[in-house]
């Protein structure tokens, strides 16, 4: 089989009979590769858009989570504060109860002493009246 002198020189005709430097199958594969690359670039662009949207969503969720976390910390601190206030109030009331108990005991002792004095005075009055 005789070789084409143009093919030996590296020149080829395509399906439209245009003169090409590349072999037709190499040219076809190059075109296919170019199309695949364009598709790949388009898909990468779509992927980047999707990932960008996901990143924004995750950022928003992170902000919301941080806000809720701060609210929870604030509520916990408020609860601790209320608990401390109640404990302080409880201690104050316990001290007041102890003070009132002591006062009640003093009043009871004073009452008993006054009853004793009253009994003695009544006895003295009775003896004084009987002596007359």
Swiss-Prot record:
Database matches in InterPro entries: FT20
UniProt record, GO biological process: cell differentiation; cilium assembly; intraciliary transport; protein localization to cilium; regulation of platelet-derived growth factor receptor-alpha signaling pathway; spermatogenesis
Chief subcellular location: Golgi
Pfam families linked to this entry: IFT20 (PF14931)
Cellular component annotations (GO), alphabetically ordered: acrosomal vesicle; axoneme; centriole; centrosome; ciliary basal body; ciliary base; cytoplasm; Golgi apparatus
Entry coiled-coil feature ranges: 74-123
Keywords, ordered alphabetically: Cell projection, Cilium biogenesis/degradation, Coiled coil, Cytoplasm, Cytoplasmic vesicle, Cytoskeleton, Differentiation, Golgi apparatus, Spermatogenesis
Compartment(s): Golgi apparatus, cis-Golgi network; Cytoplasm, Cytoskeleton, Microtubule organizing center, Centrosome, Centriole; Cell projection, Cilium; Golgi apparatus
Protein name as it appears in the record: Intraflagellar transport protein 20 homolog
Gene source species: Danio rerio (Zebrafish)
